[in-house]
Amino acid sequence: MGAPALPQIWQLYLKNYRIATFKNWPFLEDCACTPERMAEAGFIHCPTENEPDLAQCFFCFKELEGWEPDDNPIEEHRKHSPGCAFLTVKKQMEELTVSEFLKLDRQRAKNKIAKETNNKQKEFEETAKTTRQSIEQLAA
C-alpha cells in the first residue's frame, strides 16, 4: 500500500508541484524567471486571458504580472511582499519538523483568510455602490 497523498494545498509546499503549474509560462530559457526559479520563490502560475504571465505566491497570495525576462523572482517577491514568511524559511520543506510545518501553515492559512476577506469586502463595497446609485436614480 502506497503512502497517502498530501492534501492539495500542502502539495504546493513542494517545489516540483509548483513547477508543474508553469505549463504555458512564456520564459523558459536564457532568462532569470524560469519556472524553476519562480517555484523556488514560492510562485505558482495562474494565468488569465488578460494576464498570461500572472503568478501568485502560494503562501502570501501576492499576485504579480508583467514579468520581464531579467526579473529575479525572489527579489521581486521580497520587493512586493517583504513580510512573506515563506521567504524566511531556511530549510527545505521536507526537512521541517511537524511543529515547524504546522506553524508555517497556520500563517499561510491566516494569509488566505485575509485575502479572501479583503476580496469579499471589495465585492460588498462594489455591490453597495451599485445599489446606492440605483436608489438615487429612483429618487430622482
UniProtKB/Swiss-Prot annotation:
Record-listed Zn(2+) 1 binding positions: 57, 60, 77, 84
Composition bias, Basic and acidic residues: 113-129
Keywords, in A-Z order: Acetylation, Apoptosis, Cell cycle, Cell division, Centromere, Chromosome, Chromosome partition, Cytoplasm, Cytoskeleton, Kinetochore, Metal-binding, Microtubule, Mitosis, Nucleus, Phosphoprotein, Protease inhibitor, Repressor, Thiol protease inhibitor, Transcription, Transcription regulation, Ubl conjugation, Zinc
Any one biological process term the GO annotation gives: positive regulation of exit from mitosis
Intracellular or extracellular location(s): Cytoplasm; Nucleus; Chromosome; Chromosome, Centromere
Maturation and modification: Ubiquitinated by the Cul9-RING ubiquitin-protein ligase complex, leading to its degradation. Ubiquitination is required for centrosomal targeting. Deubiquitinated by USP35 or USP38; leading to stabilization. Acetylation at Lys-129 results in its homodimerization, while deacetylation promotes the formation of monomers which heterodimerize with XPO1/CRM1 which facilitates its nuclear export. The acetylated form represses STAT3 transactivation. The dynamic equilibrium between its acetylation and deacetylation at Lys-129 determines its interaction with XPO1/CRM1, its subsequent subcellular localization, and its ability to inhibit STAT3 transactivation.
Residue numbers spanned by region Disordered: 113-140
Biased composition (Polar residues): 130-140
Interaction with FBXL7 (site feature) positions: 126
Domain notes: The BIR repeat is necessary and sufficient for LAMTOR5 binding.
Protein name per the record: Baculoviral IAP repeat-containing protein 5
Species this chain originates from: Mus musculus (Mouse)
